[in-house]
Design a protein with these regions (language model features):
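A short beta-loop-alpha structural element at the N-terminal edge
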Residues: 14-28, 176-193
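Conserved acetyl-CoA-binding loop-helix of GNAT-fold acetyltransferases
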Residues: 100-116, 255-258, 264-281, 300-305
Length: 326
């Protein structure tokens, strides 16, 4: 296959920029891709909106849709770098089989844009990562051809809440687990600070407070009654942030953080157990989260220990681009 062929769309196909009006059609595309790769949908409309409106993402410059000759959306690519740091994430979704001709053209577009984003954000070189489920061989081949190399795996964890009591077990002595007070600005800042500090020694960056609040404001609903803090001697030392629409049957742990000095005391498990109880009380039938299998805090061991299993794993790939002015 020639280089020209890999980045040329079929006759009658085109690319265009997305708008928020496209969210339902984009979600349909992502669900089709998910079902082909892992057997079930694993994305919600709020996540599509979030990816289109994230800090440092401009739909009119950073995102593309591929549209076939009938006008159907068959591909979507976008970046993800909410912190503005020196690492980005390139996502490319295509409709199973039918949308494959859009894969390399979309990847070429987003990678070309990555060089410009590097210059705009002031980073050179600029690290770019991407992901693929091991069964997504066409995507893996395209990433490899584009210079990406395998880095590690992430796992999508899940657990049934059947039989989980809405009353959580007591936390360890000296630890208090309670709901967050979302109307208390000082507590919201402390909550964010715990997450930011706890993730500092991992491979995952957290956006600053303003960007984080901006992300929350863009969600259709924020379920603060499913957010938790852990206190020791009156100090917030652990935080659990949940996400996902209330009508979903899965409670989602988007962030679980415990300050380094308070780890190995059962605080992370206490937060998880309380979250599972809250989810069960709210009628959810399962709990889920994502984890970096190379996380130095050994988070995967905690999740396996409380009964979660890997629904699927995704390979993470990495390359670097040189900054280039637009």
């Amino acid at each position: 296959m020639t280089a020209a062929a890999t980045t040329t769309l079929p006759e009658g196909w085109c690319t265009r920029r997305p708008t928020l009006d496209d969210v339902p059609a984009i979600l349909e595309l992502v669900h089709a891709s998910d079902i082909a790769a892992i057997g079930e949908p694993d994305f919600i409309a709020d996540e599509v909106r979030e990816m289109l409106t994230d800090p440092h993402t401009d739909m009119t410059r950073d995102c593309w849709l591929a549209v076939d000759a009938t006008g159907k959306i068959v591909g979507w690519t976008f970046p993800h770098n909410a912190t503005g740091g020196d690492r980005d994430f390139a996502e490319v979704y295509t409709w199973p089989e039918h949308g494959l001709p859009a894969l390399r053209p979309l990847l070429a577009l987003i990678m070309d844009r990555m060089a410009e984003r590097a210059a705009e954000l002031g980073h050179d070189p600029y690290e770019v990562r991407s992901g693929a489920v091991p069964t997504e061989q066409p995507l893996i081949d395209a990433l490899t051809e584009a210079g990406f190399v395998f880095l590690k795996q992430h796992a999508r964890m899940q657990m049934s809440l059947a039989g989980v009591s809405p009353m959580a077990p007591e936390p360890p002595a000296g630890v208090v687990v309670r709901p967050i007070r979302p109307d208390d600005e000082a507590e919201m800042r402390v909550f964010h600070a715990v997450i930011e500090e706890s993730f500092r020694d991992t491979d995952h960056f957290s956006p600053g407070y303003h960007a984080w609040r901006q992300q929350l404001a863009g969600q259709s609903a924020v379920l603060f009654h499913e957010w938790l803090v852990a206190e020791v001697d009156g100090r917030v030392v652990g935080a659990l942030q949940s996400s996902g629409p209330e009508e979903e049957d899965e409670g989602w742990v988007s962030r679980l953080a415990v300050l380094r000095a308070y780890r190995k005391r059962g605080i992370g498990e206490a937060l998880l157990r309380r979250a599972f109880a809250v989810y069960a009380a709210n009628g959810r039938v399962k709990a889920g989260l994502g984890v970096d299998m190379e996380n130095p805090t050994q988070a995967a061991r905690l999740y396996l220990g409380v009964g979660m299993t890997a629904l699927y794993r995704a390979n993470i790939y990495r390359t670097y681009v040189t900054a280039r002015a637009a």
